[in-house]
Amino acid sequence: MKINGNLNIDSPVDNKNVAIVRSRNQMFFKAFQVAPNIWIAPERYYGESLKINEDQKSDGGIYDSNFLSTNNEKDEFLQATIKLLQRINNNVVGAKLLSLISTAIPFPYENNTEDYRQTNYLSSKNNEHYYTANLVIFGPGSNIIKNNVIYYKKEYAENGMGTMLEIWFQPFLTHKYDEFYVDPALELIKCLIKSLYYLYGIKPNDNLNIPYRLRNEFNSLEYSELDMIDFLISGGIDYKLLNTNPYWFIDKYFIDTSKNFEKYKNDYEIKIKNNNYIANSIKLYLEQKFKINVKDIWELNLSYFSKEFQIMMPERYNNALNHYYRKEFYVIDYFKNYNINGFKNGQIKTKLPLSKYNKEIINKPELIVNLINQNNTVLMKSNFYGDGLKGNVDNFYSNYIIPYNLNYEHSINYSYLDNVNIEEIEKIPPINDEDIYPYRKNADTFIPVYNITKAKEINTTTPLPVNYLQAQMIDSNDINLSSDFLKVISSKGSLVYSFLNNTMDYLEFIKYDKPIDTDKKYYKWLKAIFRNYSLDITETQEISNQFGDTKIIPWIGRALNILNTNNSFVEEFKNLGPIFLINKKENITIPKIKIDEIPSSMLNFSFKDLSENLFNIYCKNNFYLKKIYYNFLDQWWTQYYSQYFDLICMASKSVLAQEKLIKKLIQKQLRYLMENSNISSTNLILINLTTTNTLRDISNQSQIAINNIDKFFNNAAMCVFENNIYPKFTSFMEQCIKNINKSTKEFILKCTNINETEKSHLIMQNSFSNLDFDFLDIQNMKNLFNLYTELLIKEQTSPYELSLYAFQEQDNNVIGDTSGKNTLVEYPKDIGLVYGINNNAIHLTGANQNIKFTNDYFENGLTNNFSIYFWLRNLNQNTIKSKLIGSKEDNCGWEIYFENNGLVFNIIDSNGNEKNIYLSNISNKSWHYIVISINRLKDQLLIFIDNILVANEDIKEILNIYSSDIISLLSDNNNVYIEGLSVLNKTINSNEILTDYFSDLNNSYIRNFDEEILQYNRTYELFNYVFPEIAINKIEQNNNIYLSNNNENSLNFKPLKFKLLNTNPNKQYVQKWDEVIFSVLDGTEKYLDISIDNNRIQLVDNKNNAKTFIINNDIFISNCLTLTYNNVNVYLSIKNQDYNWVICDLNHDIPKKSYLWILKNI
């Protein structure tokens, strides 16, 4: 799909890609066609007034009638939206999505027999020109942060015919989901997926909603409901656990929609395909449209796209986050912060400025909770906000009868849109002006809908979690902490609540100490604050009770007033169990069932016919039992888990609130120090930098706490399912089984055409002897949660801050870093390499050989843990001091050096406090595995050599070791080999060291698909990671034989057989960095070469003409390998000439996965 990026707001009207067009309400606007049938209108959406009444404004909305009013703003909107479309198009599945939208033209309206009119068009003034349009992307309506998708005609959107649509979109403002910025590309993808429901005419009825969550904030039972499209699009765990459809849907949406789609597909074949009055382009678009199965669209969801684009998104209750989560908006500068790969520095590390609009966010709570005393005096007001979903007080489950005969199951799976052929679509000529015969009644009148919120108000004398949470929040920078909740709410804002016992005790302990007026005093104070906060916020406790063993969080009771009675939270939880963490405990409705009787017409069947029909009924009953299970599961998810999720959200907010308080406390102390001390400016700069790093480390500790919260409440929810819901399910199921067995037996005994032996056989065969829960595996549910244990998802980077690699090229040696931290590596050209313990090792020999690694992550400080490890082989005797590795500045930091034939680790802080640890003699010319681990929380330094602990030192007196952002690897006249130098941002324990030590020894071998070591001269089939089920085969073209992957018709191609050959005929196993030749068994033996014409991998007959490839493994996917020639990767191309070619060239736009190869045993 080609995106036209050569447009701007001043582009002249050409009535092709730039036009002045008419809106539904007869207004005119300038529109730009950026891709076939996809238009952008850089205007506010015309259908809503930009000035609305206050009561019409939505909670959380922002309203500015002047937004997007100047030509500069409009051009920025146009460029930003084009860039987002280019980002989507830059990924294979994104390009397929856009191609699918481009081809999905609505079915022409049958005006008269053989008179078909187009409904997807825009028209110019006076209807002089018509332009085909499937969708138009506008700016937002009255609420400038609301994205929306609006169909043209509701009837066509639902009956299979399809209709064009309009998207309202805000590209400039985004928000954080706590740790990460929401990527606007994923927000646009959501709108684009939704547009397919309208273009294909498969929109569900407006009343088809799913019970989504029980609103824990109201006293009465009230549900939030999710409409069907949002459910299907949302993805995440919601999608997996709410996939009970159609177990409890009476509505036949999936069945009827499929029929409607097939009807129009059939009409295309009969009425359109050979109709000479319809333009060929229209027919070609419809042909491509109907190559897609409607099920493919149902299976498109945000989880799939977020995975393919490597975009982070919330995984649970994505559609109901607003009820606890108030957004703050940030401004995206698409020139500075964003490119076609997303945020330039990632979703976490990018720094965006806060929007000026944050002060104008509409504040309309759904519920106001007044905490009152015995005199009815209001002590505090707390707000509950709506989740933006429809509310319903009816209990769906109490009225629902599980259907017996509705057996269609829409299973969840990811659609890879394999039937979308981008190359074919790009060849379709545009639909010209003269090809369009417009149907004038193609649109309904747009009527704005405003979500008017009226707050309810309740009084309570018992503080609720929301009251406790509010008491932990303050806007002022001048804070005073108190652990007395009642004292805080009586203080009228001068105090703020904290449940951090150790931290509060420490602050009380030092309250009367002398002022902190030196850097040393400050460092000690800062270190103590960090230590106590860490101990408080990450505290967990193992308990055992009647519900099993579990790890609980003791401070939850104090933080949110849950089980916060005279006993401790731990004791209350032990006695009452996890069900008492939530308010609404008795919600399970025993499902209504209706099982059909066995037809009396079968009474005189023969044994054979009776056996066959009874077996079908048995299977149907078994499937019905599965429906009953999913009904129970859905009730648990909707009514119970939603309450635990609320607690996860509130407890996580509490952690973040405490973190904010501690950071304000630190900043307050830092201001005092800067204003009231005689510390030099140089040292003040160092203190500032160190404090910044400590604030980062505090955030890391908070993340650990949030992960603990997630695990604790998820385990509690699972425990409630097992102990409170599952027994009701089994009891009910046993009764169902008993009734089914009874009716089956009674029927068989009445049968007239079989003997007693046959009756006994049929009774035994068709009775449920035991309750067999093949469809129920609680462990699978637990595993599902374990995949998403972080509510505030951290950017998925490894803990490595440096991971050294080295390899040989033709003319020089290359040294680099695989940590992904953008490390600058500087080294002399004459650096030597040798094969080491597991890989290439650096050989340091000459004087002053110096390798420098530079990145911001190397800056140590007062509180950060880190570890260093490497393989070392020393060939010298070192009697005098000889440096090896270090990170020091102004004699502050750490270093490793040789002295007295041993190795010394030195660490020194900015105040001159120093620790030197001499290690044993390592000058025996053998390889040694060195690990150094610094734990600042425990004030502990551990050193291991070859898996043996050789040093365990207290470093309590070591304060700030802030050093430069450079780590140097020095020769200093040494003669040493260094391999695998790595620096991590965490400690390493002995078990990890043991594992790494032995895995390194074993890890030098390349693995096949089954994790077996690859062998030379053994036969394999070759696959690409993108298409792991389709083997590489050959394509003959222009007298050449190329390697390809034909993923459309692979049955017609025979997989090739490959052997790996080594120049050393005695070598048996394939190792990293081996130089290999590929032999191909294709009648006669052939070999792999690279075509000089097109860089494709081709087969040649002469081994002397074969290319020698460097083979390596992927560091993240152990059973995948990479192949390079002259440091250029071999990859699988996007489809070209109906084939995915195997190519070796420098194409930076190919996704990384295309470089990964798999060898499978034959």
Swiss-Prot record:
GO biological process: proteolysis
Keyword list, A-Z: Virulence
One protein family per Pfam: NTNH_C
InterPro entries per UniProt: Bot/tetX_LC, Clostridium_toxin_transloc, ConA-like_dom_sf, Nontoxic_nonhemagglutn_C, Toxin_rcpt-bd_N
SUPFAM superfamilies (UniProt xref): Clostridium neurotoxins, 'coiled-coil' domain (SSF58091), Concanavalin A-like lectins/glucanases (SSF49899), Metalloproteases ('zincins'), catalytic domain (SSF55486)
Cellular component annotations (GO), alphabetically ordered: extracellular region
UniProt key word Transferase: no
GO molecular function: metalloendopeptidase activity; zinc ion binding
Domain of life assignment: Bacteria
Function of the molecule: Assembles with botulinum neurotoxin type E (BoNT/E) and protects it against pH-mediated inactivation or protease activity at pH 2.6 (the pH of the animal gastrointestinal tract) but not at pH 6.0. The non-toxic component is necessary to maintain toxicity.
UniProt similarity note: Belongs to the botulism non-toxic nonhemagglutinin family.
NCBIfam families referenced in this protein's UniProt entry, alphabetically: botu_NTNH (NF033911)
Oligomer and partners: Forms a highly interlocked heterodimer with botulinum neurotoxin type E at pH 6.0 but not at pH 7.5.
The protein's name in its UniProt record: Non-toxic nonhemagglutinin type E
Species in which this protein is naturally found: Clostridium butyricum
Species lineage: Bacteria, Bacillati, Bacillota, Clostridia, Eubacteriales
